[in-house]
UniProtKB/Swiss-Prot annotation:
Its main location: nucleus. Transcriptional activator that regulates the expression of genes involved in aluminum (Al) tolerance. Binds to the promoter of STAR1 and regulates transcript expression of STAR1 STAR2 and ART1 required for Al tolerance. Disruption phenotype: No visible phenotype under normal growth condition, but strong inhibition of root elongation when grown in the presence of Al or on acidic soil. Transmembrane segments: none annotated. SMART domains: ZnF_C2H2 (SM00355). GO terms for cellular component: nucleus. This is Zinc finger protein STAR3. It comes from Oryza sativa subsp. japonica. It comes from the Eukaryota. Residues 136-148 have a biased composition (Low complexity). PROSITE patterns: ZINC_FINGER_C2H2_1, ZINC_FINGER_C2H2_2. A zinc finger (C2H2-type) spans 229-251, 281-314, 319-342, 347-371.
Amino acid sequence: MDRDQMTNTMRDQAANLTSMNPLFYPFMADDALLGMAPPPPQQLLPSVSIQHMDWSPDTMLDNLTFIEEKIRQVKDVIRSMAGRRASSSSAATPEQQLVNADLTCLIVQLISTAGSLLPSLKNSSFLSRTTPPPAAAAGAAQAVSLAAGESSSSARNNETNREDEEEQMGSPDYDELFKVWTNGGAMDECVGAAGDEQDARENPAAAAEEEKYEVLQLEEDEILAPHTHFCGICGKGFKRDANLRMHMRGHGDEYKSAAALAKPPPPPEGEEQPPQPERRYSCPHAGCKRNRMHASFQPLKTILCVKNHYKRSHCEKRHVCGRCGAKRFSVMADLKTHEKHCGRDRWLCSCGTSFSRKDKLFAHVALFQGHAPALPPPPPPPTSGRRRHKQEEPEFTWGGGGGNEFLDVKGIAGVGSGSGGGDEFFSAGSFGAMDFGFGQLDASLAMLLPSEQFAGDHQEENGDK
């Protein structure tokens, strides 16, 4: 009798607890439960070989304790931030940054710890998707309901709740949630998004520039090709499109019209053209900063830039300066620029540094204290013995052929000898008394001269006669 009363008391307590908490599992004898439900299949048993897939209450308790501690720390940090904001000052800016960093670290730890709880819940025995068959579950639920003194309607409600829970755990959203947290995808996604945002904040111009243009990469043969435009009839190549259009005139009258020689017409203004992204070019050389696979990629703007960059950086320097013989270039334009100042007297500083331009020398002198422009070298000392001073003797160009043929007047008799130094050879008196009509010219110009000067000149002429 005492045993029956004890059993009835346990049933009443179980019924009260069940009504208060739907998740409460009623106390029953183990043999009664095992006898009412069929034995579960082998694949439904908890895993024994894989330890981390079993539910560990100790691990979950430690994680929950850790989460509670971090939540308390987050609350303290937020309270301190609120207090500092009330008494804000300019000196508290570094402290505010440190507090923000601490808060970010705490939140990341909370997220990672909460993610570690989800796999253990999924693989536990009471949340596992490998649930008993519906018949066994229904039998066990009915037995528990009868043992607790519940009616058949409450048993059907419990069965319906369990089916809803199973359906919720079998939904695709539930699987995706566990997959993301188990594989660490959520943390990687958060970290990756934060890294992209940080790169965009650090270099917003580069991030915006990458979206504006498309990158094209030419091959080495295309870059080093001497011609880029070719005739479709004879196959002759040209460097410029204008040269090709002029060449096409020789292939027929249809290429001589103004429309054929003009540039391609632009699209009409009325039609809306789809926005075309700007083109940028990449260097085909692997490891180059101008290659699109480089971390610090810097694109090239035009095809000419690609050609010059590739020749200067990755090709042999074949063009040699003919003046100094030391400088070598791979681009002909660079050689021509060098030849403009090669061989000229360079501006020298007292420190030994030479410059091609005077303004660069003075900028160097102004930058470094104690430096000064170097003085020109002194003239060579005079030679010992008697120095002979040679008179400069005139040389006259003979002929107009442009050659170096000169008429040497030193060999002519009477030139260079005597006190006159050859002046008498070219004097007007050597031609004799010949009148070329200068007298008449003087008479005609007498009105332009003063009367005294003209009279004196006329008397001198008469006296000479």
